[in-house]
């Protein structure tokens, strides 16, 4: 039978797996997409009576517009199978390690499989946003106050498939 560990963390003093079929150990990427827009505007109207009998009206207004966009595929918690001491993993068919950690904290773990597939994950987290605003236009201030905000981030990382303190045997031959 096959066994699959996705987004899991297995830790034991000793690991002794015998998998008749395939063993898949896969880290999961958290994903999100952001596509936002905001618009706002306002008009204020005030009427003031002064002590000398004069009065005046004071309309004012403001406008703002902004957009934000983002995209992320990121491993926050790498899947792992870790023996504190010794271990053995025998896989009848294919061992697939996708961005996960397999190994031991101390003594070596022996891993045997007909085929070993190793795949690293490319993670990214990108985003940007801006906002433009005009405000403070009134009878006394005909030139508006302006506001411009911009922010962005662009991160990348590799989540590597990793074997720690292991001897890996593929189809009878030790591999690195």
Language-model features: where?
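Binding/recognition "hotspot" determinant
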Residues: 1-176
């Amino acid at each position: 039978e096959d066994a699959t560990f996705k987004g899991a963390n297995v830790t034991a003093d000793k690991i002794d797996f015998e998998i008749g079929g395939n063993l898949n150990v896969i880290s999961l990427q958290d994903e999100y997409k952001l596509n936002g827009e905001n618009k706002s505007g306002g008009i204020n109207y005030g009427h003031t009576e002064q002590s000398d009998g004069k009065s005046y009206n004071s309309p004012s207004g403001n406008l703002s517009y902004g957009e934000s966009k983002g995209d992320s595929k990121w491993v926050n918690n790498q899947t792992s199978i870790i023996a504190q001491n010794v271990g053995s993993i025998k896989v009848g068919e294919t061992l697939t390690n996708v961005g996960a950690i397999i190994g031991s904290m101390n003594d070596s773990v022996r891993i045997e499989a007909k085929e070993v597939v190793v795949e690293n994950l490319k993670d990214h987290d990108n985003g940007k946003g801006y906002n433009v605003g005009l405000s403070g236009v009134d009878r006394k201030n005909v030139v508006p106050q302006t506001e411009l905000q911009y922010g962005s981030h662009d991160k990348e990382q590799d989540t590597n498939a990793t074997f720690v303190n292991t001897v890996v045997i593929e189809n009878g031959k030790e591999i690195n």
